[in-house]
Amino acid sequence: LVGSEMCIRDRLSEAFRLRSALKLTNRADNNIYRLVHGEGDRLPGLVIDVYGKTAVMQAHSVGMHVCRETIADALIAASEGLIENVYYKSETTLPFKADLHQENGFLRGNDNGNIAIENGLQFHIDWLRGQKTGFFVDQRENRSLLEFYAKGRNVLNMFCYTGGFSVYAMRGGANLVHSVDSSAKAIELTRANAELNFPGDNRHQAYAEDAFKFLEQAGSNLSLIHI
């Protein structure tokens, strides 16, 4: 176990060094990033996303679940003050055949302040009830790409979830942005994120309904569709 603890600490430290070299940490305009991506960081079965001073951890293997307390301690130590809270969210990611009972919850800290920043845009992150770790962190470059193409266009963001693509489209100069998701909770979150960044901006409309039915009814008014 001692050897395993040292290995985890070393690899988390390596993960922080790499993200620092990539200029993902200690930025005023960005505090959302993926710290650990499984095998890519030599920690198979583990995903850790960072939102400000909170790290959200998902175990996809029994081994990582068993080591969760060690990982939480090592994470805070390796972060050198960047991380204060560790939220464990593995109820739906652990192998069901392992018959492990583990409720989601904080392993360290207890901060529910959930506004984080990506490329200068603010987002409410719902790591308690949201999908994945609360935000699709791996879509950062795609969101920026949509922003690049959005100027002067009528945009439809299908299955919008948090509305991340919608907010980027608004900053990119879209004429109109429609956000559609069958989940009323997702639409509530999307509206909150749009209002957080562009208060009172009537270019954004959000709809809690079937995205494909909305697409059929939208006709030819759309010039950019994100699925």
Task: Please give the residue ranges for each predicted region.
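Divalent cation-coordinating acidic motifs and surrounding scaffolds
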Residues: K53
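Conserved short alpha-helical segments that host acidic/polar catalytic motifs at enzyme active sites
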Residues: I8-G38
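Non-catalytic substrate-recognition/targeting regions of SAM-dependent transferases
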Residues: V36-D49, H65-F136
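Short helix-terminating capping/connector loops at secondary-structure junctions
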Residues: R27-D29, G81-L82, P199-N202
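Short, small-residue-biased leader/transition segments that mark boundaries at the very start
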Residues: L1-C7, I227
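Conserved short hydrophobic interaction patches
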Residues: A15, A74-A78, N193
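Rossmann-like S-adenosyl-L-methionine
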Residues: R108-I225
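Short histidine-centered catalytic/ligand-binding loop motif
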Residues: S4-E5, V56-H65
